[in-house]
């Protein structure tokens, strides 16, 4: 079996039916023309935010990470492992792709520890066991994995989806594409940066050009590039016409170098 390609989905994509249609059309075409197994990892911040708003619950973030109190983890897990995950499974079904919905703890695919007590139920993902997902891939299933995990002592944790995808890529020895709302990492003038090294990222963070959630995304991509020993792509799901080229290894956003 070829090494898998992990596609991490996030941002407001889950709220955009036209974009989901284009994305799944590109996935179908890729699966038909390549024997390479695919895995989807997803967050769903927009789904969580809508639910929190409907329940009149405050949304707090610290350094780009969602603060998750004990009384909110059940709601967030329901939104991500439930609504967001099943929405993607429904799109896969519509496009005749046999898919399986998972969370990080299934088959110990990704291990999770608590990141910081101040953040509450927020986890740090670490490589786990490839056994379950490899079994699914060998049988032509598309695993769709939410970014909810569980600690060794059974505590549910909300994990940043970029970081979750990175840990799963390390588990499977997979290539990784991080799809987001933006077309890549932008410089101070709003221009896309084609390639990014750790030194350059540090410089842009110090200058306040890379901020908030993008810091988390860039650090996850740098971690992945180092762990995997190969580049990681950050690109936008908005450019549907370019997705086939991206899946084939052509950079269309920012390529993060190890």
Swiss-Prot record:
One Pfam family named in its UniProt record: AA_kinase
Per the record, what is one GO cellular component? Answer: cytoplasm
Chain positions recorded as substrate binding sites: 44-45, 66, 158
Q: Quick one: which pathway?
A: Amino-acid biosynthesis; L-arginine biosynthesis; N(2)-acetyl-L-ornithine from L-glutamate: step 2/4
* UniProt keyword annotations, A-Z: Amino-acid biosynthesis, Arginine biosynthesis, ATP-binding, Cytoplasm, Kinase, Nucleotide-binding, Transferase
**Where does the entry annotate site (Transition state stabilizer)?**
8, 217
What reaction gets catalysed by this protein? N-acetyl-L-glutamate + ATP = N-acetyl-L-glutamyl 5-phosphate + ADP
Q: What is this protein called?
A: Acetylglutamate kinase
Species this chain originates from: Salmonella arizonae (strain ATCC BAA-731 / CDC346-86 / RSK2980)
Q: What is the lineage of its organism?
A: Bacteria, Pseudomonadati, Pseudomonadota, Gammaproteobacteria, Enterobacterales
